[in-house]
Amino acid sequence: MIFWKTFFQNSTVGESYENNFKKLFLLDKTFDKIELKDVYLSNTKNINLYELEQLCDSVGWVKRPLKKVKIALKHSSIIISLIQKNDSSTRLVGFARATSDNGFNATIWDVVIHPDFQGLGLGKVVMHQLIKQLRQAEISTITLFAEPDVISFYRKLGFIKDPDGVKGMFWYPR
C-alpha cells in the first residue's frame, strides 16, 4: 500500500480545539440571503437526534431508526457539526462523523450539508476538520464511501478512488 505513504507525506499535525464551538471566520459573508457570520463549528457528541434526522431528510437520505443513530453517534470517534446560531434559535446545518480503531484506520460517515448551505465551502470545512483531528490522532488510513455524484468533491480533498486497485467489499445478510 505505497499509496498511503505518499498521500500523507505532506500532512502536518495541527492544534486541537479548546472549546466546543469555534466561529468560522472565513464565513463572515452573505450568500443568497443566508448570513453565515453566525455559523459555528462544534465537536460535541451531544447532537439533537431530531435535528440530525431533519438535516438528513433535507438532502433526501432514507430515514434511519433514531435508536440506531444514537448508538452510531455514541461509538463515533469524532463528530463535527455546523450550527447556525441566531438570537432566538440554533439550527444544525452540517454534520459528519468518523469511526476508528484508534491505531491505524478511520472511516468517515454521514457527511451532510443542508441544501441552503451547499456550494459555500462548508463541506470542505467539515472534512478538513475531520481529517485534521484524525491526523492528530496519528491515523494514517482514512476511508469513506461516496455516492457517484460526490466523488469529484472528495477527489478535490485528496481522496483516491480504488488506490492501487484496492476494492471495498461488503457482506449483507441474505
Curated annotation (Swiss-Prot):
Keywords: Acyltransferase, Chloroplast, Plastid, Transferase. One of its GO terms (cellular component) is chloroplast. Pfam families: Acetyltransf_1. Its main location: plastid. Coiled coil: none annotated. Its EC number is 2.3.1.-. The keyword Isomerase does not apply. It is found in: Plastid, Chloroplast. It is an enzyme of class 2 (transferase). GO terms for molecular function: N-acetyltransferase activity. Residues 42-174 form the N-acetyltransferase domain. The keyword Chloroplast applies. InterPro entries: Acyl_CoA_acyltransferase, GNAT_dom, NSI-like. Belongs to the acetyltransferase family. Ycf52 subfamily. This is Uncharacterized N-acetyltransferase ycf52. The gene is ycf52.
